[in-house]
A protein has these predicted regions:
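Active-site scaffold of zinc-dependent metalloenzymes
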Residues: 112-118, 171-172, 189-222, 434-456
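Active-site recognition of the HExxH zinc-binding catalytic motif
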Residues: 222-243
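Long, folded non-catalytic interaction modules
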Residues: 344-459
Length: 459
């Protein structure tokens, strides 16, 4: 009965939408839900409701623990970039997202395996499929069946709610604002799965899919839809043409503000937040949400400051233009230029080169939030050269061959031409580069890297 019910809802969602409008399919995907379940059970994930249900159950035994470990050791994410696009303006294609898409679209795990051939090595794909097959029964017994009645009622009411709110109108608003494009014959698929946790929901979007966990007691559908639209707006931004991306990057480069590069990096999240959590929420709820829109101070603050300008452009059916970008950068400079000295902001977009691989874990633990992160545990001329061409915060940590490595760094940046340093003393040095990003050089002996950084920058 479950599969028939879900299929009917999915079809009714499509057939009530005209051919001229974007199509939205809503579905439950058991293979995807099992994938998320196993993923959340791995040791790299913090405590969660899936782990609570699994721990102490009949399936909490060596056989399944071994499968969880094997799943965690699989390499599922490979990427290919779009080098003709400005750095950071278009997300790379990631194979783990293609795998998730296939889990949503497949009719069975065997179908998933056939759809996914060539995305990852066959041995890994076969093992992944076998692990998901082994965990289908535990997932149903521990998660789906105990929450089945609540979830299926939620699914029906959510489907009706989505239809009543004309989601396609918000989608078109995003297309116009971002000056992006979408072929309306391609459906946007929304996959929902139950989450036995009352503390909130998660959402993500990729390609033509949005995925959201639904807490079994969730009834704030306005909040849920606004968060899902936030994720969908990311995809609309990602699908801007190369011409639009280059125009936007040129507008940032033409602006003389020292804040322009970091404003560019904040753009994607700030715009999705002001559109989804601000504009869409107000349209659904009738009033602007007075609580935080995003659980990160830089994104939240900028989104709220941008709200009047964004609503002005939406009301005028205007797309982002150079005047909008200049006004956005001015908001950053007038209100938030101090962020250029805050580590939590600077290290959100980071390229780290070090001669000590342990620094990766240390920085990841202390500064976990990143929108762009590159890391290399060898200091070489080729790596420094690559770093100089990447317009993000550049952090170089030297702990070993001090004289040679410091000399290499000095010769790689024109801004360091007159730099004087003492290689036998511990120090942290920083300077603003011509690409309007911070270069941070740490010559470390015994002091922890986080302590050295915090002595120079705000946290």
């Amino acid at each position: 009965m479950k599969q028939i019910l879900l299929l009917f809802i999915c079809i009714s969602t499509v057939t009530t939408t005209s051919a001229q409008q974007p199509k939205f399919d809503i579905k439950f995907s058991e293979p995807l839900a099992v994938f998320v379940f196993v993923q959340q059970l791995s040791s790299s994930y913090p405590g969660n409701s899936f782990k609570s249900a699994f721990t102490g159950s009949a399936y909490d035994q060596d056989k399944y623990k071994d499968l969880i470990t094997r799943f965690a050791n699989l390499t599922l994410s490979y990427a290919y970039e779009f080098p003709s696009f400005p750095t950071g303006s278009k997300m790379p294609v990631l194979t783990d997202r293609l795998l998730k898409k296939n889990l949503i679209d497949c009719n069975s795990l065997e179908d998933f395996k056939l759809r996914s051939l060539g995305l990852i090595p066959n041995a890994d794909l076969i093992e992944l499929t076998n692990i998901l097959d082994a965990f289908t029964r535990p997932y149903n017994e521990l998660i789906y069946n105990p929450n089945k009645e609540k979830f299926e009622k939620q699914f029906k009411s959510l489907s009706a709610y989505f239809l009543s709110k004309n989601v396609s109108d918000y989608f078109r608003t995003g297309i116009l604002f971002y000056n992006s494009a979408w072929d309306n014959s391609i459906p946007f698929e929304i996959a929902l799965y139950p989450l036995p946790d009352p503390k909130g929901f998660t959402a993500e979007a990729f390609i033509n899919n949005a995925v959201s966990a639904i807490p079994t007691n969730e009834n704030n559908y306005d909040g849920l839809l606004s968060v899902m639209m936030h994720e969908i707006f990311h995809m609309i931004y990602n699908e801007q043409s190369l011409k639009v991306k280059l125009n936007m990057k040129n507008w940032f480069d033409a602006n003389p503000s020292k804040c322009s590069t970091y404003a560019f990096w904040l753009l994607n999240e700030a715009f999705a937040t002001v559109l989804g959590n601000g504009y869409v929420y107000e349209r659904l709820h009738g009033t602007v949400d007075t609580a935080d829109w995003y659980n990160q101070k830089y994104i939240n603050a900028m989104a709220k400051k941008l709200y009047p300008i964004v609503t002005e452009y939406i009301a005028g059916n205007k797309a982002i233009d150079q005047d909008f970008i200049n006004r956005y950068i001015k908001i950053y400079q007038d209100n938030y230029s101090g962020w250029l000295s805050e580590l939590n902001n600077l290290l959100t977009y980071r390229y780290v080169v070090t001669d000590n691989g342990n620094d990766f874990d240390t920085l990841g633990f202390n500064y976990p939030y990143t929108s762009y992160s590159d890391f290399e545990d060898h200091i070489t001329e080729s790596e420094i050269r690559k770093m100089t061409g990447t317009p993000v915060t550049k952090l170089i940590i030297i702990s070993k061959e001090r004289r040679a490595e410091l000399n290499m760094v000095k010769n790689s940046f024109t801004e360091l031409k007159n730099w004087q340093y003492l290689p036998d003393k511990e120090f942290t040095y920083h300077t603003f580069l011509k690409d309007r990003t911070q270069l941070i050089i740490v010559n470390r002996f015994k002091t922890p890297i986080v302590v050295l950084l915090s002595k120079t920058f705000k946290n």
